[in-house]
Amino acid sequence: MRFLKSALPFVASALSLLSVQAAARSQEPSAIQHVSILEHAVINTPSHEVDHLTDFDVTFELPDKHQTIKLELEPNHDILADDAYVQYLDAEGNVHREEPIQRHEHKVFKGRSLLRRDNGLWRPVGWARVYVQRDGSKPLFEGVFSIDNDNHHVELKSTYLQKKRVEDASIPDRKDEYMVVYRDSDMIRQVRSELKRSLISSSSCQAEKLGFNSDPQHPIFRSEFQDMDLGMSSYGSMSLNSLFGLSKRQSDIGGVSGNAGGVNLAQTIGSTSGCPKTKQVALVGIAADCSFRASFDNDDAAKQWIINMVNSASDVYEKSFNISIGLRNLTMTDKTCPETAPASTQWNMPCDQSNITQRLNLFSQWRGQQSDDNAYWTLMSNCPTGSEVGLAWLGQLCNTEVTGDGSNSVSGTNVVVRVSGGGWQVFAHESGHTFGAVHDCDSMTCAQNLEASSQCCPYNRGTCDANGKYIMNPSTGADITAFSPCTIGNICSALGRNSVKSSCLSDNRNVVTYTGSQCGNGIVEAGEDCDCGGESSCGDNPCCDAKTCKFKSGAVCDDANDSCCSQCQFSPAGTVCRASLGECDLQETCTGNSSTCPADSFKKDGEKCGDTSGLTCASGQCTSRDYQCRTVMGSLIHDNNTYACPQFDSSCELICTSPSLGSCFSINQNFLDGTPCGSGGYCHNGRCDGSNFGSWVEQHKNLVIGVACGVGGLLVLSILWCMINRCRRARTVVKRPPMRPWPGPMPPPPPQMGQWAGPNRGYQGLRAEPPPPYPGPYQSATRYA
């Protein structure tokens, strides 16, 4: 007990935030200190007009910065799926109108930004994503571009004023519409440690309790430990939630969002192993609640803002993971919030009726009822909870179902609140959690040494604090334009291990997107042979014509897009296009007559593997319940003797123990799909499916034989004992006592003398005569006349 008491603080720090299904929150951006007016914008086409397929340049000035900027742009069709549609819900949550989203109505572009030097030449300085609202001689557009890693956010006057907070910079009051620009560096950088302490004190998140983990005598720890009533033996399961009062949800404000599944994140920094080698697309659904819709003048404005947000965020995913984000479904509610949330859309309610956590749970329940195969769903809202503006379930990419324990509903969902400054960054951040990313380490988590247990992503192997430079920083800040090398390794390794599913990602061929087939979007859609992403992206591609999206003469495939293509020809049969990652993962080879690598295939779940008894295949990995406990929990507490608690073998939640711990700990993470459970069942998304008694007998044959032999032996011994005892009784002569003579008829009853007053006492206290003796048991039967 002394060891357990001293070890519990460390165990808590290592395990309390280990849930792949934990929720992580985002903090509201800092105040905007300065805003510039964008002037003299010119679309450089003959008519100064563009359509959704135009490649063009736009130049403009930022007078107060003495800068002239050019954006070289081309259509970006990635974000809108061919079968994309928008449905409009009424106040009761019923669909009253549904229509496809027409690609030609949305002028969405991507490209690069350039800064004019004093000598008149242009210097490339970053990337750009733009949504053109109006072309002509006085164009209007919104989006983001970067200059030397400093994001510049372009918004219309009306958009800025809709989101403006009291602490944000004011802008001129003009009647006409115009464009403003503010930079990440224009947002006041507050001292993060002080900010977080002030926010934590008013937050419902329990992450602030992590402080007691370094001190076993901390009052919170001491009272929890001394007062808790386990109500079970030392082999019972102690949930860390009940043990320490910790929630399954971890706040971005607190600095911790979960765990990387037992992988040492320092070992995977910068590694793209596990991410797709050829471009893939994550098609998502987005729903907008009444508060979000009410923040716009009309449906079109809200729709355009969402498309622009996805357009901006997709850039960092393409660069980091070779995965673009596309919008397939858009659900819009009425701008008037219902007094009571309708049963069909319980997440659609006024801000004062729920917090962001409740909205995530309700939205997850709704998502589980949708019949689609989207990578995930995002709920757009205008209802922050205090300073919290984002919330996501960790590692739930491709999870279309909903599971939970009564208080939490888990699915592939997140919530994003419309904010002043960096709205697309919040969407990119929460989507990162959905892809399985934990937070970058900051001063608070480094002080707790959480990088050692991979509960945060260190800057590099020698430096812990990432200094707020990247997308997965717990709070928004200046110069955040990319994912950290550690996050890239975090997500890619999770995809490669199948601890985060990737089955919903679309191969870049015949993809159906919201915008319809468009040459130059980098997605090979119906009617196209290839699509290398437009002339600026294709470069000297020898296989694909960038203008027509058709193969060049003699080409039958595109090396840049097809796994079984070499020098524009099909790779020879037998060429390995997807190598095996282990005994349970089968390698795939090219057929010789196709450019597509066959679908990823694994050995059957439950098939024996490895040299150690008890190992079986699960989701393409050779593993076991004990092995997963060792790799997940054991790696954190540095105990190689960790194993799965046998009394919970029907559970698909990791419940582990070790001789040093003595008790079972529930760490709120599921076994891999395909892991054996119960009586012949297999885990699937946290549930044990297919368990039955017959399978249990087969699975535990040795135990059944042993028990049967033991019970059978007891039965044989019992029968022999009865036979021996019977024989002994048969040899014993029973001697009856001599028969008494017949005593004659019973005497007449005495005269009635009143009530009987008590034992052996008659009326008036006289002693009564006792009744005559009853004939003994061995007397002959007596006849009566």
Curated annotation (Swiss-Prot):
Disulfide bonds join 398-492, 446-464, 577-597. GO terms for biological process: proteolysis. The active site is at residue 430. It is found in: Membrane. It comes from Aspergillus fumigatus (strain ATCC MYA-4609 / CBS 101355 / FGSC A1100 / Af293) (Neosartorya fumigata). The gene is ADM-B. It is an enzyme of class 3 (hydrolase). The chain crosses the membrane at residues 704-724. The keyword Nucleus does not apply. Residues 737-785 are annotated as: Disordered. This is Disintegrin and metalloproteinase domain-containing protein B. The keyword Metal-binding applies. Zn(2+) binds at residues 429, 433, 439.
